[in-house]
């Protein structure tokens, strides 16, 4: 990684001098062919996607006043939407034809990385040749360097300044918007990755490079309808094309679970006609996890490592628990999911500052936990408090989130709290960063819940209650979606008979939150429950 940065820093002055003229996106796409395929795919997607009305009770989620003013990638690419697949992907006619053909065959079965019959020719081996074009702004160049360094550090992928390679990544800022190809394509030669004005943040450049390495969007997975619902009435019919599913012949998930917190996932308002949610999480507690721009998630990185066969670097295997795996560049250590740490990923991830950590033991008696990371304009990097809420074997954990202070942004990737309620700890958890209109009730699948309070320079605060409940640990809806108790009954099939109703839990704890405003409710909570665990950083 250090070599990469030094090479780039020393080469800034010469980039763009002798580069060939870059064709425009409109030169690379045959409009007649593209529009014909787009119409077919839009029709197929409309027919194949379950419907839900924009005004149904299932879509009436709380509306937040988001503090971020960042445009979505599809908005940044508004002028080029007709030429791009799913808002920011340039596909060759042949590649797009294969996706349409597979949809026509209705062959949706398990397989988000681009993998077809040409694999492994569709991945970059032994390295990724690249050029940084002189049209890139200083901010875009710096962000691309950081994104390449990230992928180099966390995977076995290596980036190399192009010499004479005919197939390479040509990173440009010549046009508006942010877009890329998917995987390596010999037929294209110079594969353009465009980072225009407004696309300079790390979350976007790492997203576009992930496309170039082979990742499709997360919501285009074959199984996405088990986890999210598309609100078709909020999407123009011509944009149904952008919500198409990519089938197994062109995509591989490598056994990784669907991750709403993936940097490759659409924002909840993507392509929305009225600014409302066009994508609804079937587990309503996961809605604010969708659309983060912090950077690649644990599963995003794991998929690239699998896609490039990085595990082959480690001949001597070590034990990594909770979904962790050997680091492809240091086989003596484990890469652990967020919230976990230690030599084998069995322990708690190290906190910063170190004093805000520990195990919170859940029992039948309800306990309250409060954590507060104070604002600090001089803070450098991420401040993070990590806890594990643990219950005895055979028990599950009920958590009621009463109050949150954070930076209310889509994806809650700045200040906020994350709770991992699923049995699979590799999946991004339920995030909260906006003011709650009423307490949020969740129930775990297992007997451990990692709790992560994250802040930059601003404040992050959470107050919640937790206790145990009897029941089988692997409770899940019949459609296969793994969820916590915060499930929207209008979107899911009925739970199995051993399920627990969230309203019943609220009544059990005498919480009449619907009859009081948030401020009065917080006063009520503070007066009736004793703080047993408090962290003030």
Curated annotation (Swiss-Prot):
Expressed in the hypodermis, rectum and to a lesser extent in pharyngeal muscles and intestine. CDD domains: EGF_CA (cd00054), ZnMc_astacin_like (cd04280). Residues 306-346 form the EGF-like domain. Residues 356-471 form the CUB domain. Disulfide bonds join 156-310, 178-199, 314-334, 336-345, 356-385, 412-433. Transmembrane segments: none annotated. Glycans are attached at residues 77, 481. It is found in: Secreted. Residues 17-111 form a propeptide. Its cofactor is Zn(2+). GO terms for biological process: proteolysis. Its EC number is 3.4.24.-. GO terms for molecular function: metalloendopeptidase activity; zinc ion binding. Binds 1 zinc ion per subunit. SUPFAM superfamilies: Metalloproteases ('zincins'), catalytic domain, Spermadhesin, CUB domain. The keyword Cytoplasm does not apply. Residues 1-16 form the signal peptide. Keywords: Cleavage on pair of basic residues, Disulfide bond, EGF-like domain, Glycoprotein, Hydrolase, Metal-binding, Metalloprotease, Protease, Secreted, Signal, Zinc, Zymogen. Zn(2+) binds at residues 207, 211, 217. Residues 116-311 form the Peptidase M12A domain. The active site is at 208. Metalloprotease. PANTHER family: DISCOIDIN, CUB, EGF, LAMININ , AND ZINC METALLOPROTEASE DOMAIN CONTAINING, ZINC METALLOPROTEINASE NAS-23. This is Zinc metalloproteinase nas-23. The gene is nas-23.
